[in-house]
């Protein structure tokens, strides 16, 4: 595609711009557009949100009216949650109206010098590990004395931080954001891994991988070589420098692990960066996240000592393999952010013997391969949420000896207290506990912790790594994790 870096052609004074989405991103877009003297109008299907913004003087329009007048707009700037199939975006595409995401707008404004000298963008994406890796990267940059701002899918939108003094942006981007950012050319970008996720949004695994690969079109492209899909993106990357990382001994042009140390053979000839034992995220996934972050930091010249110091002091974020308590010799860990099978598998493999708390909304993903890979680590499973039966079926097929407790709650349960029954499929026996009472989230997690304690022995780990989204029973993965932690605290007394 032609180089459109810094091209703001549709944003001439007086041009009509439609902004879709009334949330944090949409408001950030309006703020960025205001100095450009364009006529911005906000569209959302949430009538209450539109009314609240209209009361503050924001020009708003209902989706139906926006579709009817779509040809009057010079540009649509969309929030990343809107899929290409969304009616207003489909209408814009059919009418030939350009569609940018908020990241595309931020990239072009920054490249055009609207906020001073353009920053160098270091972009992290992947199905799993994005937030931890981006946080590690930011800490490495700061430890190296660089002015860095953490932004994107973590914290503030990129548009909201461009007025801050910074040399570098540590940016976490989702596949949704990347889909709508075709001109992005970061200083360095990493694809950590690519597994089935959001296929309902992207339409296919190939389309999902293509959107992830957009971070590889800048100067330095980095991929996780232990992930076959991510590794397959490197040969076709447009970047002038291509780097891989792996858990094993690195070849030339790679980062990896040798004798328990992180080793850089891409930007140096075998220099040690850190001791794996100092990484504050358990298991191989923590090492992989550290390698991905280190590759981007090394791409902009951060010294090995700064990388080691940052990793030694790094603390994992909330709901990401977070230890929330110990009861009778059993450690309880909140990894509620493990919202797909790939993330759950990585989480479980960090521990020897696990009582697995799983379920929620699987979004069409299969858990069969996950269960096959971790069956020998499972001491038991406690299943929650709308798609719990899919997990139960996979356990019956691939881990028939693992005891299972299935919790039925919310709309699926008509009881006010707690009922219990036994179900069997062949030789596989499942305890079914019906949980009543309100709020549902508290009742569910209280029952989860009680059931998990029955299944666990001293030395085991009770791991909330659901492999599914949370919105069937919780407001988000954060509330799910908070409810789990509160139930553990109550059990401790």
Swiss-Prot record:
One of its GO terms (biological process) is cell wall organization. Gene3D superfamilies: Mur ligase, C-terminal domain, Mur-like, catalytic domain, NAD(P)-binding Rossmann-like Domain. InterPro entries: Mur-like_cat_sf, Mur_ligase_C, Mur_ligase_C_dom_sf, Mur_ligase_cen, MurD. Its EC number is 6.3.2.9. SUPFAM superfamilies: MurCD N-terminal domain, MurD-like peptide ligases, catalytic domain, MurD-like peptide ligases, peptide-binding domain. ATP binds at residues 126-132. Pathway: Cell wall biogenesis; peptidoglycan biosynthesis. GO terms for molecular function: ATP binding; UDP-N-acetylmuramoylalanine-D-glutamate ligase activity. GO terms for cellular component: cytoplasm. Keywords: ATP-binding, Cell cycle, Cell division, Cell shape, Cell wall biogenesis/degradation, Cytoplasm, Ligase, Nucleotide-binding, Peptidoglycan synthesis. Its main location: cytoplasm. It is found in: Cytoplasm. Belongs to the MurCDEF family. HAMAP family: MurD. PANTHER family: UDP-N-ACETYLMURAMOYLALANINE--D-GLUTAMATE LIGASE (PTHR43692:SF1). NCBIfam families: murD. Cell wall formation. Catalyzes the addition of glutamate to the nucleotide precursor UDP-N-acetylmuramoyl-L-alanine (UMA). This is UDP-N-acetylmuramoylalanine--D-glutamate ligase.
């Amino acid at each position: 595609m032609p180089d459109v870096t810094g091209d703001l052609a549709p944003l001439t004074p007086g041009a009509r711009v439609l902004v879709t989405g009334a949330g944090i991103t949409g408001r950030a877009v309006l703020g960025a557009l205001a100095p450009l003297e364009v006529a911005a109008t906000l569209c959302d299907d949430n009538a209450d949100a539109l009314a609240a913004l209209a009361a503050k003087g924001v020009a708003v329009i209902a989706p139906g009216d926006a579709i009817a007048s779509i040809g009057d707009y010079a540009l649509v700037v969309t929030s990343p949650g809107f899929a290409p199939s969304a009616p207003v975006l489909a209408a814009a595409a059919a009418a030939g109206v350009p569609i940018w995401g908020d990241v595309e707008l931020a990239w072009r404004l920054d490249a055009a010098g609207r906020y001073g000298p353009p920053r160098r963008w270091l972009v992290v994406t992947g199905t799993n590990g994005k937030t931890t890796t981006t946080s590690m990267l930011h800490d490495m940059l700061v430890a190296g004395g660089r002015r860095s701002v953490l932004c994107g899918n973590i914290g503030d939108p990129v548009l909201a931080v461009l007025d801050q003094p910074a040399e570098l942006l540590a940016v976490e981007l989702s596949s949704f954001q990347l889909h709508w950012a075709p001109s992005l050319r970061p200083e360095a970008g990493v694809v950590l891994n690519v597994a089935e996720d959001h296929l309902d949004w992207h339409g296919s695994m190939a389309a999902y991988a293509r959107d992830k690969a957009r971070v590889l079109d800048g100067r330095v492209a980095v991929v996780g070589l232990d992930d076959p899909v991510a590794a397959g993106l490197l040969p076709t990357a447009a970047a002038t420098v291509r780097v891989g990382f792996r858990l094993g001994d690195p070849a030339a042009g790679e980062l990896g692990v040798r004798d328990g140390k992180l080793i850089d053979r891409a930007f140096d000839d075998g220099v040690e960066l850190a001791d794996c034992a100092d990484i504050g995220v358990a298991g191989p996934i923590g090492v992989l996240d550290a390698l991905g972050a280190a590759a981007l930091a090394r791409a902009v010249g951060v010294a090995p000592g700064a990388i080691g110091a940052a990793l030694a002091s790094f603390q994992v974020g909330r709901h990401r393999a977070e230890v929330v308590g110990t009861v009778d010799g059993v450690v309880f860990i909140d990894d509620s952010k493990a919202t797909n099978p790939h993330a759950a598998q990585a989480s479980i493999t960090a521990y020897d013997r696990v009582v697995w708390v799983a379920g929620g909304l699987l979004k069409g993903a299969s858990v069969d391969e996950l269960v096959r890979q971790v069956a020998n680590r499972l001491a038991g499973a406690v299943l929650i949420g709308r798609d719990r039966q899919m997990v139960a079926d996979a356990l019956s097929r691939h881990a028939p000896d693992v005891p299972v407790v299935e919790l039925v709650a919310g709309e699926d349960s008509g009881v006010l207290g707690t009922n219990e029954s036994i179900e069997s499929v062949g030789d596989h026996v499942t305890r079914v506990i019906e949980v009543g009472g309100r709020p549902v989230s508290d009742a569910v997690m209280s029952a989860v912790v009680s059931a998990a304690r029955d299944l666990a022995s001293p030395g085991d780990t009770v791991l909330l790594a659901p492999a599914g989204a949370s919105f069937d029973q919780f407001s988000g993965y954060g509330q799910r994790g908070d409810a789990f932690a509160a139930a553990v605290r109550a059990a401790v007394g």
